[in-house]
Amino acid sequence: MERNVETFLGCDKEFDEARIVIFGAPFDSTTSYRPGTRFASRTMRAESYGLETYSPYQDLDLEDAAVFDGGDLELCFGDTNKALADITAFTEEVMQAGKLPLMIGGEHLVTLGAVRSVAAHYCHTSDCT
């Protein structure tokens, strides 16, 4: 997996050393009223450079965390089912590699793709239904 050029909060670790994988889901095909949520992940990355990464309360710096930024998924605009399937597949790929997925950006519906994957990965009994 290749690292994104513009990373979130300087999360520039390599995939193999990362514990968390950030990825964007730029999609807004079912947004009503005002589209534009597809630009959220790119904007979040750009604006994150103005944030302080060090927490004096925790005495930790986010730049020291093992986080890989995989960039944005290339989602098919206008094909909601395909976009959700792509998000589900990528989230599963991240979890199969033993890493935690962290999706940013996109409309509310994109969460469904990630939740489907997480549920399939962790719910092996009827307790999850």
What does each of the following model-derived ranges do?
Residues M1-C128:
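Metal-dependent C-N hydrolase catalytic cores
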